[in-house]
Structure formats: C-alpha cells, structure tokens
C-alpha cells in the first residue's frame, strides 16, 4: 500500500496526538499514584504516632524488661530506686513542664517518651548509662517505626541527662534533666539501715516531699523540698547535689527560666 505525502503528514499528526495523550495520561496517572502514596505515608505516620505514646510504651513488655534489669543492677550496687516508678514520675513531670510552657502536644509526648526510657542504659552498666541508654532507645524506636526526626530528638535528650557528661541544649533535654534531678523522695531509699546510708541515701531519706513548680509569669522554675534536718541539713543537701543543681540551672535557662531551690521555705539557690 502506497501513502501520499498528505497521508504521511496526517499519520504523523495522529501518532503525535496519540503519544501526547499517552504522555498526558501517564503523567496524570503518576501524579495520582504519588498523591495516594504520600497520603498513605502520612496516614501511616499518624497511625504510628497514635500508637507511639507514653501510655503505650509504658506497657511495652520488652522495654520494661530492660528497665527492671537496670533497677536490679543498681540495687546490687547500692543505688536508690530506679524502677518504673522513677521513670514514670520523670516522664509525667517532664511533660507537665513543657505543657505549662505552652509547647505543643507532640513535643509533650516526645519528652514523656524520653522520660520513661531515659534509664535504659542501667541494664548494661551505670557508667555511661545515658549514652548506652540512648542507643538502646534508638533501636526500640526504629523498630516501632518512629519518624527519624522524633527518634533523634528523644535519643539526644536521653544522651544528655547525666550530670557527669550531659548538658541541656533544647527544650526536651532541659525538661528531662529538671524532671530527673528533682525526683528526690524518701521512698527511693532501699537501704533499711540508716547508720549505713551513703550521701545519696541520706539526702533522699531526708526529703519528706519535693515539688517542682513553674511560674510562667515570673519565668521561674522552683524546686521546693521539705527536709528533715535531723538527717540532712540544707547546706549538706546543696553540697551533695551541687553538680545536679548547676545542671538544673542551665536547663532552666534553656527554657527561658530561672532556677530556684527552696528547702523548708528558705531559698538555697
């Protein structure tokens, strides 16, 4: 069959038209598929974050195994209680600090998670437990499908919480430090023989109550402690915990606050 020149032109136009339509539908289909995938990813992230909450991880059996092991290690070494009661208190207190300061619900949830996980490293060794705990938390959070930016925020806070090597550098690390260092109370002492108390036992046993209060108007965060001075004087308390108090001062500054320590109604720092 022979084609005339005009026929070849018409066929060429037809092919161009078909190719153009094909490209249009291809691009349109790709766009729709991309939109659907992005929507599914967003939904998946939302689903993960709904599951990845302080309340949920607090009931994660595998996580609690390591926290319990860490507490047993510290018990054998003569340390105060570092059980889930401590980590839960730190989680709740840290969350309250950021909530009081107006941070969004997501930030509050992240600091609660960091607070609950912060002592994981004690299951390996008390020495450098902040860093080993951060690495352990990384694996848990990655396995649970947490977004990288959330994992980074949580493990950074955990890695900075120990006074021997850490420093507050952002709201999460600051709130975690303040919550952890303010958990001073009599029932953390496991030693039942007062004559054999070490300095930490003595301070904790002397603490009849301790409360952390945030005054957003005056921009002050105050640790109020009621001490039994027959066991530990206010000056002794400050001397023993001076490094921790300096860490709290820095943490408060990161949050735009001043740190105050009040014992039995008297300002110590």
Show the residue positions of the predicted features.
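Short, Lys/Arg-enriched N-terminal segments with co-localized hydrophobic residues
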Residues: 31-48
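Acidic/His-rich, divalent-metal-binding segments that scaffold phosphate/diphosphate chemistry
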Residues: 45-129, 140
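Terminal helices and disordered tails flanking the catalytic cores of nucleotide-processing hydrolases
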Residues: 183-269
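Aromatic (phenylalanine/tyrosine) cluster motif
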Residues: 3, 24-31, 35
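Divalent metal-dependent catalytic cores for phosphoryl transfer on phosphate-bearing substrates
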Residues: 75-76, 99-214
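Extreme N-terminal basic, low-complexity initiation segments
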Residues: 2-9
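N-terminal amphipathic/hydrophobic targeting modules at extreme N-termini
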Residues: 11-21, 25-26
